[in-house]
Structure formats: structure tokens, C-alpha cells
A protein has these predicted regions:
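Aromatic-rich, lipid-facing transmembrane alpha helices and their immediate juxtamembrane interface loops
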Residues: 2-275
Length: 275
């Protein structure tokens, strides 16, 4: 039987799958481990000046770690999904702009590290690269953990929102310790005010609701079961922020990162063939 030629998009998606599959351990473990070392060395001013918190190296590393998630979701991006993801990008910029200008909903804070080009001199242009994967990774992990319970909206959405907030409970203390940003009023949770997490409940609820409507959940779950690397970006999250939190003694945040690692282990996502 003659082989059927894939359309250009299909060929690109298959090629991206192959690149990620062949380099899973490097992308999901080596990159975040090196990233953690580089960030900690930058925080201690141990690197040559231009390399300390180099924004373009940082963005390159983050983009590489996002590849498994991008490759995993790409075949599911219909026109409806694209509109939803575009809306989420706009929402990310909007709520961050409001937050910086008013201190609501996260609390008053300022960036302390160059995160690349800024929009209006205030909001990082790469913000969706940081925000959206938190929501998508939480959504995917919860689909696996909940199983058939994920069919119930009243269960699925609150659990995913809780997972997103839990991820920020692991991330924000590490980011503050590194000096990525600082809250004017501080906070007893490793320098982070609880108002930040109240804000995250709000922003996560909106983002999860949009994502839930944008993606076909049945097709997403089917792809998730077939695509072994689809949650590797969450593996990177556990490695990177777990290491940083341990270094600074943020033990609760480190344990939360480890909890997500446990979720990955329970769902059989720590498998890196050919490493």
C-alpha cells in the first residue's frame, strides 16, 4: 500500500515529536538542573557580569523546557483552541498590567531581574511563556490523577484551580529568593503575601475556565495517554524550583514541588528511555 503524504503541519508536528522524544532526559532534567545552577550562581554573583541573570539565556532555557508541552498540545490546536489560547495570552498581559499599576489582585510588587523585552516598560513580553504552562500542566496532571472524575465539571475545575495555586506556592518563594521580583509589603510565606495567592485563585479560575472551553477534553486526554512526554515540562518545574527552594531553605515550597513530582510518579510519567 502506498504511503500517504502528511500535510505540512502534520510533518512538522511529527518532526517536533521526534525531537522531543529523542531528547526527553536532556530537556526535562538536564536543562532545569543546569538552569537551577545558573540561577543560583547568578544570585550569588558567581558568574561573569553579562551572564548573571542573562535574560536571553533564561528565555532560551525556558523555551526549550516548554517544548514537550508545545509538541504535546500542538495537534489539538483547532481554530477554537487557538482563539482560546490567544485570549489567555491577552488576559495574562491585562491582569499583570492591572496588578503592577494597582497592586490588585496579587499585591504591590516590582520586578528585580531582567526578564527580556518589556511591554510598556512594565510587563515582560514573554509573560505567557511563564504563565500559560502553569495552567496547562496543572490541567493535564489533574486529568490523569482524577481519571473518570474529571468528567464532572464541579470536580475538575476546582481541582485544577487548586493545583495552579499550589504550583505558584512552590514557584513564588523561589522567585522571590532569587530576586526575580519582590513584594513591597513582604509576606511571612517566604516574602510572599497571602494576597498574592488570593489573586492567583481569581486569575487561575478565569484561565482554567477559558482553557477548559478552548480544548476538546476527550481528545486531550487521549493524546495525553499516548504521548508519554506531554508532562515533561512539569518534570522540569519540579527539578528547577525544587532545587532552588531547597538551596534557600524554603522547605514548605520545596515539599510542594516534590508533591507534584509524586503526582507525576503516581501517573507513571517519570520514564526517560534511552537516557
Amino acid at each position: 500500500m502506498a504511503s500517504v503524504e502528511l500535510p505540512a503541519r502534520g510533518r512538522l508536528e511529527r518532526r517536533l515529536d521526534g525531537v522531543v522524544e529523542d531528547n526527553r532526559f536532556t530537556i526535562a532534567v538536564v536543562f532545569p538542573a543546569v538552569g537551577a545552577f545558573t540561577l543560583l550562581a547568578s544570585a550569588e554573583a558567581l558568574l561573569p557580569g553579562p551572564l548573571n541573570f542573562n535574560a536571553y539565556l533564561l528565555l532560551f532555557g525556558v523555551a526549550v523546557m516548554r517544548l514537550p508541552l508545545v509538541a504535546g498540545v500542538a495537534p489539538l490546536v483547532t481554530r477554537r483552541a487557538a482563539v482560546g489560547l490567544f485570549a489567555l495570552c491577552g488576559y495574562t498581559y491585562a491582569i499583570e498590567t492591572v496588578g503592577i499599576a494597582t497592586g490588585y489582585p496579587y499585591g504591590t510588587f516590582e520586578y528585580g531581574v531582567n526578564l527580556g523585552p518589556m511591554i510598556g516598560g512594565a510587563v515582560p513580553a514573554a509573560l505567557p511563556l511563564f504563565f500559560l504552562p502553569l495552567v496547562v500542566n496543572a490541567y493535564l496532571l489533574c486529568l490523569l490523577v482524577l481519571g473518570s472524575l474529571a468528567d464532572r465539571t464541579a470536580v475538575r475545575l476546582p481541582v485544577v484551580v487548586t493545583a495552579v495555586v499550589g504550583m505558584d506556592l512552590a514557584l513564588d518563594p523561589a522567585a522571590v529568593s532569587l530576586g526575580f521580583w519582590a513584594y513591597d509589603a513582604g509576606g511571612w510565606y517566604y516574602g510572599v503575601p497571602w494576597s498574592n495567592y488570593a489573586g492567583w485563585v481569581l486569575s487561575a479560575a478565569v484561565a482554567v475556565g477559558v482553557l477548559d472551553r478552548a480544548l476538546d477534553r476527550e481528545k486531550l486526554f487521549a493524546r495525553l495517554e499516548r504521548c508519554r512526554f506531554m508532562l515533561d515540562d512539569l518534570v522540569s518545574f519540579v527539578v528547577l524550583w525544587g532545587v532552588v527552594n531547597v538551596y534557600f531553605g524554603n522547605w514548605i515550597a520545596a515539599l510542594l514541588a516534590a508533591l507534584f513530582g509524586y503526582g507525576l510518579w503516581r501517573t507513571d510519567r517519570f520514564d526517560f528511555p534511552g537516557r
